[in-house]
């Protein structure tokens, strides 16, 4: 009986040729009758099936892939080397020597830093071996990647004849500032940097302006500038900065800087209009429109109430704190009126008694204006501070503390009222013009959330 584990033919098949011819069909039938699997591979590439004729028992044989002569076949292909072909055959000592002596242009030896990292080096060990600090290593590697992206004709379309501009020692610092932009923006920003001979600090300002321009949509004057022009993006960033300046001279200076770079005619006209208003105010002249009314462009920038930004730990360090009920802007006036009022306070033990239960509370420092209105004060939570009637630069939540006992509208005040089911903040002057004599509450103070002193990405990269 034939065993599947034995690849050799039956002994009877090796005696004589005639006997082999008579027993061969039986041998095939025996082999097929004892197979339970659907197919079995035989030595030499043959196979048999559980059903069908002899032609169905053989599967097509595909030889395994063969490696080139002298090379081991490896199904896994490692990622391509970051080194150019001219540097791939260098040993470790030669690579370190090139970095140590800064041999060649910076973008030629910058890939060696990445290759050393793959070989197990860290920034500290590379600095010890080559003298290149970790910050400079990061700058060289990132700048090299930015430079390579400029060479991509499909995405960047950057003229190759302009690339030698960045071959100088200051080239890595300039290209490093473009790391947050996409390939198209990098090409446009690089052309602008070359045209205006910008230093790294100026390129950083340009890159941040181009990155932030889409997020500033909806702000006053935004539609007059073009997003496709790096100069217009930079001009609008300076135009926007001028509207946040407190001193009128600082405002004029920012607008003059914006006028130096603005490219489109609509953007230039908008900057010139704002610059004329600022210069009139600096000269002490009142700007009057055709109907004889005072221009409120500058006045609209002033809040009219105290606006404070909390510091981290300020509540914990405060001598006294005040607990106030909180309502959302979508809750409406009914919820604001139903918020609890303070009934009794134990100053010694800090126990506060209110007239009803409430779910959301805010703890703020015991500022004087808030303490005076604490009995009837309520906190209105706004999801976006840019909805306030004055100009705010950041999209951030704010807390509006209002006194419900003061509802009469005066032109100098700021008030909370309901419009289309939402709580909004409006100036008293605007409400008086609309004939509104009473509001839901008068704004006492506006609280902005804590913020780091420098909210941008650190200019230095740590090891």
Swiss-Prot record:
Region annotated N-terminal alpha-helix, chain positions: 83-275
Disruption phenotype: Seedling lethal due to a lack of RuBisCO.
Biased composition (Basic residues): 19-33
Domain of life the protein comes from: Eukaryota
Keyword list, A-Z: Chaperone, Chloroplast, Coiled coil, Plastid, Transit peptide
Residue ranges with Gly residues bias: 43-53
Subunit comment: Homotrimer.
KW Chaperone (keyword) present: yes
Keyword flag Transit peptide: yes
A GO CC term assigned to this protein in UniProt: chloroplast
Region (Disordered) residue spans: 1-84
Name of the protein in question: Rubisco accumulation factor 1, chloroplastic
Family: Belongs to the RAF family.
Residue range covered by the transit peptide: 1-31
Localization (cell): Plastid, Chloroplast
Domain notes: Has 3 domains, the N-terminal alpha-helical domain, an extended flexible linker and the C-terminal beta-sheet domain. The N-terminal alpha-helical domain stabilizes RbcL dimers and RbcL dimer-dimer interactions, facilitating RbcL(8) formation. The C-terminal beta-sheet domain probably dimerizes Raf1. The 2 C-terminal beta-sheet domains are swapped and pack against each other to form the dimer interface.
Gene designation: RAF1
Database matches in InterPro entries: RAF1, Raf1_C, Raf1_HTH, Raf1_N
